[in-house]
Amino acid sequence: MRRLSLLLFFIVVVTAPLTAAAQSRVGVLLYGTPATDPNFASFRAGLADLGYVEGRNILLEIRGAEGKPERLPDLARELVGLKPNLIYALGGDVAPSIKSATSTIPIVVSVSLDPVQAGLVGGLARPGGNITGVTLVSSDLAAKRLQFLKETAPAISRVAVLWNPAHPDFEYKETLVAGQRLGVAVQSLEVGNVGDFDAAFRAAAAARAEAIIVASSRQMLLNRQQITDLAARHRILLVSGWGPWAESGALLSYGPDLNAIIRSSAIHVDKILKGAKPGELPFEQPTKFDLVINLRTARAFGLTIPQSLAARADKVIE
């Protein structure tokens, strides 16, 4: 019996370091937390799809800014100090901090911005450097959202764009250009922190904006309920890029399936952990975009959705 106990002890002692060595260590940087981010579970599911089991063959070192963007640089440096095999950053609000923190550790990002225009990489087909991942945008998405809004409410002549200046995207500028073509005045509503939302909506109401287009960012997504509540209070239509917004009361949304795209980020993680170089892995881009229309919201604002537009919708919320 004693021999058996000693043998078991020897097996545990010898194999424990091997098990630890077999684990890939992946840092994760979030704008919120695993509990508050509505899409982080999709990334975890993507890892599971590829055979990764947390605690067995992969260890996730997660750091979340809890909605406080000023914490991101310190958290990024903390993750780099852990010397993980790779770091995953969820969100365009987050990616610049991790890029600034390391130029050697491989980074995979999921961002709703153009990585080239934002200065994250040199090109989508061949990023170069230590960053690759998925981008959730294409060049004409902002223009199409405004176009769909005009088809739904042709009389609209004033809209505002709610955006985060710390999120280096170009949705406001693209909407501004589209507005000039469609005869719509476009107002800028910059929101640097959560406390600015009330003031932004008051400014929109004072300018008699008839609709607000919510630019894509983690900051906006994590504060979706507050934004939809403010829109209802001021009776201003909302338009955004992700289906959950329409489900929460926005008039319409147009964009890719956010969870599916983020889930696919795990493929890049897997390839890099198996030896691929991030700079040689092309950025993935969505090829399918969903139009979701909320008929309840349309009726509440006295709008009739044209049959031609309803027929093109991927989902209609009755």
Predicted feature locations:
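Short hydrophobic alpha-helices and adjacent helix-cap/hinge residues
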Residues: 1-318
